[in-house]
Amino acid sequence: MATRSVLLALVVLNLLFYVPPGRSGPNVYIQKIFASCWRLQGTCRPKCLKNEQYRILCDTIHLCCVNPKYLPILTGK
């Protein structure tokens, strides 16, 4: 009887730790917040689109790509 209980406990623990491959990870909204920059107006990407500019780096490989209408006006020389 004890063997059956241990086996049942192992099966239940195995099912609890199983993560389906298609739905694992944070949801889309959380990913968007953590992959954004420039006051949530920009997106961290390896390469910016044609209509975007970058001013800062998100990390060592990603650029903060921002639409020029959200960038401040540069003054000076």
Swiss-Prot record:
GO terms for cellular component: extracellular region. Residues 1-24 form the signal peptide. InterPro entries: Beta-defensin, Beta_defensin_dom. Gene3D superfamilies: Antimicrobial Peptide, Beta-defensin 2, Chain A (3.10.360.10). Disulfide bonds join 37-64, 44-58, 48-65. Pfam families: Defensin_beta_2. Belongs to the beta-defensin family. GO terms for biological process: defense response to Gram-negative bacterium; innate immune response. This is Beta-defensin 135. It comes from the Eukaryota. It is found in: Secreted. It comes from Homo sapiens. Transmembrane segments: none annotated. Keywords: Antibiotic, Antimicrobial, Defensin, Disulfide bond, Secreted, Signal. Has antibacterial activity. Its main location: secreted.
